[in-house]
């Protein structure tokens, strides 16, 4: 029996183009000026200190830190410091109405149905927890954060590491075999499966021929009571 569902965001609940064509450019355009202006104020000061640790450069100047952040963006590196700064910048965009969090139309009805069935819902994304809450708090469908029991980001571990899913199961307090993980990336599903999770792969485009996970194209194809082994 599935007692908890953990879902990815990018390519799963939300179109990858929203993240890459709207969110990422918005943050990139504002990052240098924002970091420079806020470098001595919290929480940016602490985030930059963490970034210095991340790049092993304890005396890095603000210019060097900005350069590192742009390199991380170019590489699409899952840097916790970068994700935290992006989340802060995106907050202004959401609050100002510059954009709303995009959801596939099949997502909300399924989440509401599963919640009504007594299944706890969680999010696990490489984006910061703050950014996750913003996307669902300012979504196309309004604020749907009440549907989720918790959020996880790279602080729990990388998404392709087995230990990350073991950590999530421990924090949720549910046996891995009773947790369903939804993602569009089969390497993430591989790690979750090795941790004992049940898995389903969301295919929003072409089928993934390299994956052995059961594939669905929409959330309304998912029945938590009938998850293929």
From Swiss-Prot:
Keywords per UniProt: Amino-acid biosynthesis, Hydrolase, Magnesium, Metal-binding, Methionine biosynthesis
InterPro entries: Enolase-ppase_E1, HAD-like_sf, HAD-SF_hydro_IA, HAD_sf
Coiled-coil region(s): none
Pfam families attached to this UniProt entry: Hydrolase (PF00702)
Catalytically driven reaction(s): 5-methylsulfanyl-2,3-dioxopentyl phosphate + H2O = 1,2-dihydroxy-5-(methylsulfanyl)pent-1-en-3-one + phosphate
Lineage top rank: taxon: Bacteria
E.C. designation(s): 3.1.3.77
Catalytic class of the enzyme: hydrolase
Cofactor(s) needed for function: Mg(2+)
Biological or metabolic pathway of the protein: Amino-acid biosynthesis; L-methionine biosynthesis via salvage pathway; L-methionine from S-methyl-5-thio-alpha-D-ribose 1-phosphate: step 3/6; Amino-acid biosynthesis; L-methionine biosynthesis via salvage pathway; L-methionine from S-methyl-5-thio-alpha-D-ribose 1-phosphate: step 4/6
Single GO BP term: L-methionine salvage from methylthioadenosine
Single GO MF descriptor: 2-hydroxy-3-keto-5-methylthiopentenyl-1-phosphate phosphatase activity
Cofactor annotation remark: Binds 1 Mg(2+) ion per subunit.
Job of this protein: Bifunctional enzyme that catalyzes the enolization of 2,3-diketo-5-methylthiopentyl-1-phosphate (DK-MTP-1-P) into the intermediate 2-hydroxy-3-keto-5-methylthiopentenyl-1-phosphate (HK-MTPenyl-1-P), which is then dephosphorylated to form the acireductone 1,2-dihydroxy-3-keto-5-methylthiopentene (DHK-MTPene).
Protein family (similarity comment): Belongs to the HAD-like hydrolase superfamily. MasA/MtnC family.
Assembly with partners or alone: Monomer.
Stated name of the protein: Enolase-phosphatase E1
Species whose genome carries this gene: Enterobacter sp. (strain 638)
């Amino acid at each position: 029996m599935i007692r908890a569902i953990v879902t990815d965001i990018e390519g799963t609940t939300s179109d990858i183009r929203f993240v890459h064509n709207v969110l990422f450019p918005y943050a990139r355009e504002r990052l240098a000026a924002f970091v420079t202006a806020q470098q001595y104020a919290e929480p940016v000061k602490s985030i930059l200190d963490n970034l210095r640790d991340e790049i092993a450069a304890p005396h890095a100047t603000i210019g060097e830190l900005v350069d590192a952040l742009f390199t991380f963006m170019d590489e699409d590196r899952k840097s916790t410091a970068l994700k935290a700064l992006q989340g802060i910048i995106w907050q202004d965009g959401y609050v100002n109405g510059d954009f709303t969090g995009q959801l596939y139309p099949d997502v909300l009805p399924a989440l509401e149905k599963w919640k009504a069935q007594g299944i706890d819902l969680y999010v696990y994304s490489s984006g910061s927890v703050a950014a996750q809450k913003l996307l669902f708090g300012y979504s196309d469908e309004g604020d749907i954060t009440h549907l989720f029991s918790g959020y996880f980001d790279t602080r729990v571990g990388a998404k392709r590491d087995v230990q990350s899913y073991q950590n999530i199961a421990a924090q949720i307090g549910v046996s891995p075999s009773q947790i369903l993980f939804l993602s569009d990336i089969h390497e993430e599903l591989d790690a979750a499966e090795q941790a004992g999770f049940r898995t389903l792969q969301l295919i929003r485009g072409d089928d993934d021929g390299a994956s052995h996970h059961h594939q669905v194209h929409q959330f309304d194809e998912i029945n938590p009571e009938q998850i293929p082994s």
